[in-house]
Amino acid sequence: QLCPTQSLELGPIADISRGKTNQDKIKIEKDSCVLCGLCASVCAFDALNLEIDGKNIQDLPNYPKWTHFSEIDEENCIYCGKCSYSCPQDAVFFQRNLPKPTDLIHGNISINEEDCLYCKICEELCPVSAITIKAIPESSTRTDLAVPNNIEVDLNKCVQCGVCKRACPQNAIKQVCDTCMYADELPEPEITGKTFIDNNCVYCGYCKELCPEDTIKVVKPFDGEMLIPEAEECKDCQDCIEVCPCNALEIKDGFLSLNEERCILCGACVNACPLDALQLRRSSMKLENITNASWQKIIGKLLE
């Protein structure tokens, strides 16, 4: 819509999103493109880029600058992972480093093998699979006759829960937890990690909505509103739902429903609707440093 040489063409985005075709979402007519950089400047999601002498125009002083952003306060992040699991664009990554169980709890398990029946009850009940009962052949010639006769406890896995001790029918297991009686006095486990948002972010704010510690800040590129059609206008083709990059649209009780908090006013749904039933009204945008008067006029169409 803004290209002064009409060198951009939008592909069949609904079919592309459904996997029916492998066409590009945007086709650039290179013969008519004059490399003005207008399209790359107005794209709030870095889908189009133009480089001049090896430098992205977004880093050059004379081109418009977007000021919207998304960021995570890592100092207060608890590395729960909700932002990563919920991101519709898989743009949030996190790595969590947990302490070893043996650093948090200490104890010992002893087995009286004279009383042990090797019945495997403790092995099957152990919640962390710390107990292994094996059948070690007594004869190298008849390994098929081996019966369970060996028990091992992996103290690196054991959490000193005592389930094995309570379940043993022979009372053959003794369990002593050195730290359990002081559990309330022990320091909290130190959980470290790293969380970051990559360039696939579309600034929907869903991660911010779910974050239990309010450590995520999101400033969207546009302000305004999206008007969804009345029931009789919508034919339930769901093209708009397919192309929405932030899962802001869904069918509820047979009607198209919009999550306004998640909508980024990108206009993908408007372009996909075969009936032109959706209306986009932008009131402002986070685009600054528009120094060229002709560009100001063209870019202003985004708010019409």
Regions found by a protein language model. Give the residues of each.
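Flanking helices and flexible, charged tails adjoining ferredoxin-like Fe-S electron-transfer domains
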Residues: 1-304
